């Protein structure tokens, strides 16, 4: 197995067969791959020929040194945030290419899942990637920089955006803003707003995410 650019929590195919799909799950700010791997554990038997990889983001988190960040979110300057996100995007792209090469699978067999800052990363990375990823499931996220993304979109994978209506970390208003923006860019977008749900992945959200993956990648 290739030595990846990121440390990752990983799960081989539930069927023990040669993998036919790859699901990469990107955690939120201050979390790690182990955190989001709970989704992989819940989904594995329903995607039996998929391998799951849950990488740790490249930087130690500024506000939670026991966790990781894709980029520093304590700064409030949009240009600085974009600049830092582009550094992380380059690294995530390297990781995706390493994994695809390792398993000798086409990018059409790759799906990305993200939570919070991880969602921000997968949207920006996937839409700018020349080869089109199969689909994205993005929980509780937003678009990092609409102007930058609108000028650099080259891929249009199917995307499922989900958010809790009681989210105080990333406002649920970003769900509709992101949908409106992405539809304007000719992407197929599915959305779900959960009632009485805070900044987390609900049980229903997990089930709907799995259903979306099964529909698109199997």
List the predicted regions and their residue ranges.
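Serine-hydrolase catalytic machinery in alpha/beta-hydrolase-like enzymes
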Residues: 2-105, 109
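Conserved alpha/beta-hydrolase "nucleophile elbow" surrounding the catalytic nucleophile
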Residues: 27-29, 113-115, 164
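Short alpha-helix in the alpha/beta-hydrolase fold that links the catalytic acid
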Residues: 37-40, 171-181
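Active-site signature of alpha/beta-hydrolase-fold catalytic machinery across serine-
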Residues: 38, 124-128
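Gly/Ala-rich beta-loop-alpha elbow adjacent to hydrolase catalytic centers
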Residues: 114-118, 122
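A conserved short beta-strand
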Residues: 131-143
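C-terminal catalytic histidine-bearing segment of alpha/beta-hydrolase fold enzymes
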Residues: 160, 176-218
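Short beta-strand/loop motif that positions the catalytic acidic residue
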Residues: 161-163, 167
């Amino acid at each position: 197995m290739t030595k990846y650019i990121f440390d990752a929590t990983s799960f081989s195919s539930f069927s023990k067969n040669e993998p036919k799909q790859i699901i990469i799950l990107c955690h939120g700010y201050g979390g790690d791959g182990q955190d989001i791997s709970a989704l992989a554990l819940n989904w594995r038997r329903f995607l039996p020929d998929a391998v799951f990889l849950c990488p740790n983001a490249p930087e130690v988190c500024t506000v939670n040194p026991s966790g990781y960040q894709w980029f520093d979110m304590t700064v409030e300057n949009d240009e600085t945030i974009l600049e830092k996100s582009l550094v992380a995007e380059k690294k995530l792209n390297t990781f995706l290419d390493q994994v695809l090469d390792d398993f000798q699978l086409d990018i059409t067999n790759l799906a990305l899942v993200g939570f919070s800052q991880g969602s921000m990363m997968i949207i920006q990375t996937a839409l700018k990637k020349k080869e089109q990823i199969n689909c994205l499931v993005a929980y509780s996220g937003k678009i990092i920089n609409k102007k930058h993304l609108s000028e650099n979109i080259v891929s249009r994978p199917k995307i499922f955006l989900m958010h809790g209506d009681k989210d105080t970390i990333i406002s649920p208003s970003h769900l509709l803003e992101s949908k409106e923006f992405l539809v304007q860019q000719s992407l197929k977008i599915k959305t779900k707003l959960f009632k009485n749900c805070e900044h987390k992945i609900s049980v229903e959200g997990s089930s709907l995410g799995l259903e979306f993956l099964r529909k698109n990648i199997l």
